């Protein structure tokens, strides 16, 4: 664990923009989260705001309130939101300067780097704190090109993909990793986004900050490193998906199957979402789940189960979609946030047996 942390949300904690904050509130091995800064939900428990489950993480209106209530500044202040284009908004920049002035190191997952802001860097140097831009790419000489070494990895790979972005793929992947471990399956998770790193996953890379020529190689390197460095070695390696195979604003997922060697897929879907996120004005509709499963099969992977995101649905509506899809597809369909993913463990166990025999 790196230390204690305060998560800054710029008044967006109760929105989908705060998925980094949501992930850290749900669980992280990298930080001990002491609080969230978010004006609209101040005074409440962050877990209760997120999903109704109290986690003992208070929400403060300001950084000043947080430091005063906690008695001392946490070690880190984390940007907990995603912005349009990954830009550092004036509000977030001001909050980072305030956090630095209070004595906190800052952690930023946006595409715009705090370390390249002269005023922010000078302020951090003066206060003796650090700036971590999680999405800042490694030097080209340190990046890896795909070599085929992943083909020698003995643990089957299972990718958690989605029919769109911002569906909860990472959360489902973590839930599944934990459920497998509880059931005695040695499972590891390869992160592919900034939140996965912030949650403390040991192996992975930030996919959208790597030049395209090296994405497959960085994925392979993470998988091979996980296989070689784990003791005992994993029985299953989960791969966190990004975006969706057919999202025109940023298609992703085929790398996990073709370059990562994933022969199994868990497919996350939001039944109430008709169009790709942010593209409704262009009438760019999300393909049906059955059609997506057929495409996944063309890539050479088998969809083991479907997991559902409940956005904009009542409990009754979500259950109805669950029953309908299970009947149409003939595979398990589960609601991770509502019922967990333990029902998928037998399916995963059979997948491991089948792939190990193969």
Where are these regions (language model features)?
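Flexible phosphate-sensing "switch/lid" loops adjacent to ATP/NTP-binding sites
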Residues: 1-76, 80, 84-87, 139-159, ...
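Bulky hydrophobic/aromatic packing residues
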Residues: 79, 93-95, 105, 164
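Short Gly/Thr/Asp-enriched flexible loops that form oxyanion-binding sites at enzyme active sites
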Residues: 89-97, 118-121, 250-255
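Extreme N-terminal, non-catalytic leader segments
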Residues: 95-157
């Amino acid at each position: 664990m790196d230390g204690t942390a305060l998560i800054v949300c710029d008044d967006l904690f109760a929105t989908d923009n705060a998925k980094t904050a949501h992930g850290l509130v749900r669980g992280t091995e990298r930080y001990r989260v002491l609080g969230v800064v978010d004006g609209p939900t101040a005074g409440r428990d962050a877990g209760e705001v997120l999903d109704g489950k109290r986690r003992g993480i208070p929400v403060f209106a300001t950084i000043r309130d947080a430091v005063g209530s906690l008695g001392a500044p946490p070690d880190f202040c984390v940007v907990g939101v995603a912005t349009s284009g990954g830009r550092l908004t004036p509000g977030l920049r001001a909050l980072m300067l305030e956090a630095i002035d209070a004595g906190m190191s800052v952690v930023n997952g946006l595409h715009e780097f705090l370390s390249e802001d002269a005023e922010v860097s000078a302020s951090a140097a003066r206060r003796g704190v650090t700036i971590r831009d999680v999405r800042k790419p490694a030097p080209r000489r340190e990046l890896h090109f795909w070599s085929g070494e992943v083909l020698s990895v003995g643990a089957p790979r299972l990718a958690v993909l989605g029919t769109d972005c911002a569906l909860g793929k990472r959360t489902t992947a973590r839930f599944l990793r934990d459920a497998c471990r509880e059931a005695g399956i040695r499972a590891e998770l390869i992160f592919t986004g900034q939140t996965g790193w912030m949650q403390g996953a040991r192996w992975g890379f930030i996919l959208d900050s790597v030049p395209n020529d090296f994405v497959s190689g960085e994925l392979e390197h993470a998988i091979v490193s996980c296989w070689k460095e784990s003791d005992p070695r994993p029985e299953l390696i989960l791969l966190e998906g990004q975006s969706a195979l057919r999202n025109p604003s940023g298609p992703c997922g085929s790398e996990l199957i073709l370059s990562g060697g994933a022969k199994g897929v868990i497919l996350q879907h939001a039944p109430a979402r008709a169009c790709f996120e942010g593209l409704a004005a262009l009438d760019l509709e999300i393909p049906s789940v059955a059609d997506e499963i057929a495409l996944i099969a063309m890539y050479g992977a088998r969809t083991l189960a479907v997991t559902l995101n409940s956005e904009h649905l009542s409990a009754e509506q979500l259950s109805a979609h669950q029953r309908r899809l299970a009947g149409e597809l003939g595979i398990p369909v589960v609601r991770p946030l509502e019922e967990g993913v333990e029902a998928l463990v037998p399916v995963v166990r059979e997948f491991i047996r089948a792939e190990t025999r193969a």
